[in-house]
Amino acid sequence: MSGAFEIVMDERKTLVDKIISMMKQGYFFNKEEWDRASLGPQNPLSKVQYKGGNRLRLMAMVVEHGYTDPRWATARQYSQKGYYIKKGEHGVLCEKWIFEKQKKVKDENGRETFETVQLDRPQVSFFRVFNAEQVQDFPSFSGNEYKEPDLDQLIDRIISTSECPIHEIAQERAFYSPSEDVITLPLRSQFKDQTSFAKTLLHEMSHSTGAANRLNRRFSGPFGSEGYAKEELRAEIGALFTETDLGIHLAGEHYEDHSDYLRSWIGVIQNDYNEFFRACADAEKISDRLIGNYTKKYELPMLMAAEDIPDRNSQEKQTAEPERTEASL
C-alpha cells in the first residue's frame, strides 16, 4: 500500500498533466471556462479559504467539472451538519504539509515550556474534499450577495497600492523593469476591456514583488530560458490568486500573445511537476503581499460564504423530541 507521500506525488502528477493539456490547447486561466472559478474555493463550514496548490487544484476541478459553487468540505464536515455525499461521487485530494513542531524544553528556571523547531524532513498528509454540488440537499450557493466591483475604481485603487511607479504609455509592451523598479503598461484604451487591463496590471505587479527589498526572487535568464519561464509562471498564478481575492473575473485576456509563455511553462513543469507546486507556494506569497498592501487602504469585497449552514442533525433531533407541555412536566 502506498504511503501519504507517494499518494500526494501521484495526485500532483495527475493535476500537472491536466494543466499541461490545457496549455497545449492554447490557454491557461484566460478562457471563459476559468470564469467559473472567479470566486476562489472556500470551506463554508470552517470558514477558511484554500491556499497555494490546494487553491489552484480546486479551481481546476471547478473548470473540469463545470461546478458553479465554490464551496468545498470533507465528507466528515458535511456529515457533522447532517449532509451526505451523493452516491458515486469522488473527492479531490488536498495536501497538508508540516514543516515544524513544538518541542518540550526547560527554561532558565527549570520550568517546562515549548519551542518551535524545524523538522529535518517535512511531513505530508492529505484529505479529500467534495464540492457542495456533490452533496445531497445541501443549501444552494447564495453568491454572498456579491456584486462585481466597479473596475475603473478598483484599478485606480490597485495602482495606488503599488510599491513601485506604474507608467501608462502609448506603446506596445507591458513589462516590469527590475533594474529601474518600474512597471510600464500600454494605455487602457489599447486593451480589449478593463478586465484585460486589470489582469495585465496584476501580472506585472506580481513581478514587482520579486525585488530584493520585497520577496527577493531571482530574475534570471533571457526570454525563453528556464529561469524566465519560472518567474513568469509565478507571476501568472500570483495574479490569478489576487484576481479571485479582488472579485475580478478570470476571462480577461492578456495584452500580449502568451503562446510563447505557454510553451515555456510546459517545458518547466513537464520536466519537474513539483515545480508547479513550488510556483503555487510562491504565488500565494505574491498574492498575500499585493492583497496586504491593498487592505492597508481599502476593504476587500465580501467573497466568503457568509451564511450559516443549517445543522440538519439538530433540526432532526428537535423534530423527534415531543413538545414539552405543562401536562408532561
Briefly describe each language-model feature range.
Residues 1-328:
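N-terminal accessory/interface modules of nucleic-acid-binding and processing proteins
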